[in-house]
């Protein structure tokens, strides 16, 4: 039977010694958390001025880092995107190993292995004809899974806040942990796959020759050829396809459904792959059930900074505080 512990913050050094003498093995997890919380308060008592300095350092570092990142992205977008992608891929792995999140580690290894294979196929020259569709189908699949996972996680969190978890006799902390975990999985892999898809989209499109980041395309586009994958289009725009339909943009260029969805939604491209005319996503995806996918993609872009750069900035702040002797 776990002992009942009353934790009171106060009493100076005597109270701190009493907290150090508490046997944590006899306490429940909640009581252990209370003791650790009281120890932290006792340790940092009287450090208000020091804590104010640390807050100022944090604010200043965040402002300076944000300005530097914006300038870097504007002046050297390619290197910024590559470093951000590497940060997105590696930083969570450190916390996974440190905190023993083995389930996340298994999923991360599987995702990394398949994505590495797909990326390898996308960067080969000459490009195999089936590679573009393979790449876009894989990333579109991950995009839909991450989208659904994020929605389920968000609903679980909201149900917990409204107390609906009690109808199923589920503890609030268990329901909240489940919802937050699903939300994290959906958002993290949603951001990561979009960055990989954008990189592969640029490389494949420039290799095929119908697209170039700067300048004119190196090949002339036929009316019956998809500029994303370079394959023949057999289904008319007005016909209903068995596997996929054919889409026509406002510039009158036609594409395979999976290709243009991968290019615009997953690959984050807002222009025609051939003529670079602005793409009207609302017109192309007229079904109202498809529009949340576009808004979800914009949400993932906002979260990229939080996942990739926030841990680095926090680590930098901790390093500055350590050098200055702040605790």
Swiss-Prot record:
Catalysed reactions listed for this entry: S-ubiquitinyl-[E2 ubiquitin-conjugating enzyme]-L-cysteine + [acceptor protein]-L-lysine = [E2 ubiquitin-conjugating enzyme]-L-cysteine + N(6)-ubiquitinyl-[acceptor protein]-L-lysine
Metabolic or biological pathway, per its Swiss-Prot or TrEMBL entry: Protein modification; protein ubiquitination
Assigned GO CC terms: endoplasmic reticulum membrane
SMART domains recorded: RING
Alphabetical UniProt keywords: Acetylation, Endoplasmic reticulum, Membrane, Metal-binding, Transferase, Transmembrane, Transmembrane helix, Zinc, Zinc-finger
GO terms, molecular function: transferase activity; zinc ion binding
UniProt enzyme class: transferase
UniProt record similarity statement: Belongs to the RNF121 family.
Name this polypeptide is given: E3 ubiquitin ligase Rnf121
UniProt source species: Mus musculus
Lineage: Eukaryota, Metazoa, Chordata, Craniata, Vertebrata
């Amino acid at each position: 039977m776990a002992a009942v512990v009353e934790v009171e913050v106060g009493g100076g050094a005597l109270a701190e010694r009493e907290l150090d003498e508490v046997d944590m093995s006899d306490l429940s997890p909640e009581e252990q958390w209370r003791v650790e919380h009281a120890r932290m308060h006792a340790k940092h008592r009287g450090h208000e001025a020091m804590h104010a300095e640390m807050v100022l350092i944090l604010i200043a570092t965040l402002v300076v880092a944000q300005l530097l990142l914006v300038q870097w992205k504007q002046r050297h977008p390619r290197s910024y995107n590559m470093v951000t992608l590497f940060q997105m891929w590696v930083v969570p792995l450190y916390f996974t190993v440190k905190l023993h999140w083995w389930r996340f580690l298994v999923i991360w290894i599987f995702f990394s292995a398949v994505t590495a294979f797909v990326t390898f196929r996308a960067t080969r020259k000459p490009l195999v004809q089936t590679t573009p569709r393979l790449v876009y189908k894989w990333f579109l699949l991950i995009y839909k899974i991450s989208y659904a996972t994020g929605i389920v996680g968000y609903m679980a969190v909201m149900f917990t806040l409204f107390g609906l978890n009690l109808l199923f006799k589920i503890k609030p902390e268990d329901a909240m942990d489940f919802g937050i975990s699903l939300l994290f999985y959906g958002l993290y892999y949603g951001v990561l796959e979009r960055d990989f898809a954008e990189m592969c989209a640029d490389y494949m499109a420039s290799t095929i020759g119908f697209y170039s980041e700067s300048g004119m395309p190196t090949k002339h586009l036929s009316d019956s050829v998809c500029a994303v994958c370079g394959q023949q289009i057999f289904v008319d725009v007005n016909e209903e396809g068995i596997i996929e339909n054919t889409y026509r943009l406002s510039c009158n260029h036609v594409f395979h459904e999976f290709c243009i969805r991968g290019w615009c939604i997953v690959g984050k491209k807002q222009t025609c792959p051939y003529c670079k005319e602005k793409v009207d996503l609302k017109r192309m995806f007229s079904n109202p059930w498809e529009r949340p996918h576009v808004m979800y993609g914009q949400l993932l872009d906002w979260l990229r900074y939080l996942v990739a750069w926030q841990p680095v900035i926090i680590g930098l702040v901790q390093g500055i505080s350590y050098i200055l002797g702040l605790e």
